[in-house]
Regions:
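Active-site mouth loops of central-metabolism enzymes
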Residues: 3-15, 82-102, 181-193, 251-257
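N-terminal small/glycine-rich loop or linker at the start of catalytic domains
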Residues: 1-3, 64-90, 126-136, 165-186, ...
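Second-shell residues forming the walls of enzyme active-site clefts
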Residues: 34-52, 149-300, 304
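Glycine-rich anion/phosphate-binding loops
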Residues: 37-43, 89-109, 142-150, 191-193
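N-terminal hydrophobic targeting/anchoring segments and the immediately downstream early-domain regions
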Residues: 1-59, 65-75, 330
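Preference for extracellular/luminal or secreted protein segments
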Residues: 1-24, 257-330
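Glycine-rich, aromatic-flanked loop segments that form ligand/cofactor-binding clefts
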Residues: 52-80, 100-127, 147, 155-171
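Hydrophobic faces of well-ordered beta-strands that scaffold small-molecule active sites
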Residues: 2-8, 27-31, 57-63, 118-122, ...
């Protein structure tokens, strides 16, 4: 199984994609709006993917709530943006945490019903007023401790539905003044304590995602995704994260180079999984040919994440989630 999670082109699995996945099995797939039209179509696509992917393949979706949502009305619920949860916490911390958990549980329930196993949420980045709005209202708060508490509640709700949450974008995207989808941010500060704290306080999450950002305080040249120093010293070291580490999308313009080379470099730097989302067949094939197989340590982390999700789902009282969904008018 190759150390990559990849996208596909459209709402149906192409014969060329199926053949590629049989020849070079990826660790999983990630689906976007272009792949999701309505529930029956998605069910067919999921069945076709399961038929060609490894038994424990990851089915990932970027379902944060707010403006980042791939499962959308009218077939799936709309969920509040992260900033709304922060405002609720400011008014009433206990209620804010409860609604954060419920939001996570409902996001998780939607993902589980659709056949996904992992969602790229919650966002652990700081809200920084003068930064680029690529994070913006996706951030829970300005206070790192409030972020940590709300993110833990969201992640716990997601986990209660049997879905594996992903904390992102380690070690923090909030200060970036440019959009890493378009160019490479460089954050010139020697004090990253506030940025790192929400990640450190949630270091037991099953997954984290790296940031495509250069922090000269961590590595003067390489973005975190490609930096052994930033990954080993900060994410694995200072933050203390021991779970599955996945890159942000290697198709983003923050990174220069062939996606296949970037994937190989990210794995060599210490990431467990390279994420390549474009859905374009030729570069996806190049990534899957070139990236190594999942390492023994990565395989163990993936297995631990799966087992944790199964335990949380089995311990969740289905009647409780159903009652709370009814209470919310979902």
């Amino acid at each position: 199984m190759k150390a990559a999670v990849v996208g596909i082109a459209g709402p149906a699995l192409l014969p060329e994609e199926a053949a590629l996945f049989r020849a070079f099995p990826p660790a999983g797939v990630i689906l976007f709006g272009r792949n999701i039209a309505e529930p029956a179509q998605l069910a067919r696509l999921m069945a076709d993917l399961r038929a060609v992917l490894p038994a424990h393949a990851v089915f990932m979706v970027d379902q944060e709530g707010g403006r980042v949502a791939r499962l959308r009305p009218p077939y799936w619920r709309a969920h509040p943006r992260a900033r709304t949860l922060g405002h609720l916490f400011d008014s009433n911390p206990r209620a804010g945490l409860r609604i954060a958990w419920l939001t996570g549980a409902l996001i998780g329930a939607d993902c589980a019903e659709a056949g996904f196993t992992v969602t790229a949420a919650p966002v652990l980045d700081l809200s920084v007023p003068d930064a680029h709005d690529v994070i913006g209202d996706r951030a829970l708060a300005e206070d790192p401790v409030v972020i940590a508490r709300l993110a833990r509640a969201v992640a716990a709700g997601i986990g209660a539905a049997g879905i594996q949450p992903v904390g992102k974008h380690a070690p923090g995207h909030g200060r970036a003044r440019v959009d890493s989808h378009l160019s490479l941010p460089r954050v010139e500060t020697n004090d990253l304590a506030a940025d790192i704290r929400p990640f450190a306080l949630n270091s037991d999450l099953p997954w984290m995602m790296t940031a495509h950002i250069v922090f000269p305080a961590l590595d003067p040249i390489l973005p975190v995704t490609l930096s052994p120093r930033a990954i080993g010293g900060t994410i694995r070291g200072h933050i203390g994260f021991k779970g599955v580490l996945v890159t942000d999308d290697l198709a983003m313009k923050a990174l220069d180079g062939r996606p296949a080379d970037l994937a190989q470099q990210a794995i060599a730097a210490g990431c467990d999984i390279a994420l390549y989302c474009s859905g374009e067949l030729a570069p996806t094939e190049a990534v899957l040919r070139q990236v190594p197989v999942v390492s023994p340590a990565g395989a163990e982390r993936l297995a631990t994440a799966r087992a944790g999700a199964a335990r949380r789902r089995l311990s969740m009282n289905p009647a409780l989630l159903a009652a709370e969904r009814e209470w919310l008018g979902a």
